């Protein structure tokens, strides 16, 4: 009993001493100044993507569209308003995936500081694009080809494969014209066609509008494009694919860019078993470039991600369709990344990266001075921008010769 009293006395004395020391000395935590709107914005706004400076967009865009959406994502918005807009089931699904925070990520006072920082430091109007340099292509003669048979206004695919001209519209009708015999036929598919490679046809699912529903599908046709079989369905708004052996079984697999909406992914469908493997889980997967980068005989690939954290990544294959991602170029969320390709433009034996960034259909619809075509060179394993040509709403870049 006596020992117990001694222990209690010692413990009490220890607590009193610790309390005295805490009150006597100024610890950094107790004297830390309140964070500014700029500091808070860098803390929270850079947690999901590259940090956007206020100056990149005009004040009315920040105030009327971007800041309200940021507020909703951080759990400070009116949940009833969000639910009425996207539906209860969709809201719960997105909250579970971390798109919308159910509990506030910061205090209301902190949010007001962020809001004020962006509004006070953003320009009243967007910056104009720089004057374009004159080139011979601007004075060349281009013949416009009109598809007079296409009654539906929204064309989702246009391409020539061997001697067949193929078009598709928003209704999911695939029209095939033999350029030799001039014979035509059409095939009805579940949804609009967005990509065709060899005899494989990719359908986006739904009606082209953004959705979380997984309605996309991949179909394999015969040589005449009359009969087809379903390869895989329940794809999340797929927009591009490659048909290539990724696991060394001599059977081609399907590498699919499931663009999605709030969520999305890059997936591989085994050509033999048709089993699906998820390679990356980010929205906005746009297109691929296949390359054996390290010359080990395994097919690697580059991929462009155009939503949230916009970037171009290199995925190295271990030979069994397991990939390691390395981000080679990172872009802010307002960049508008749209498409990319690799090509040796200056005949030096090394490929340059050509990129179009002009997507302007989300929360910041305004003319942007930084939209256009960019060229990056691989300089000592680092990609550096060496050329920019401003073009509003640029969505795709090509490298070819247009000569008679």
Enumerate the language-model features and the residues they cover.
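Beta-propeller-forming repeat regions
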Residues: 30-39, 43-404
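Compositionally biased regions
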Residues: 4-5, 14, 32, 128
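Positively charged n-region of N-terminal signal peptides that target proteins for export
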Residues: 1-6, 241
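Aromatic-capped interface at the extracytoplasmic side
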Residues: 25-28
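Hydrophobic membrane-insertion alpha-helices, especially the h-region
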Residues: 9-22
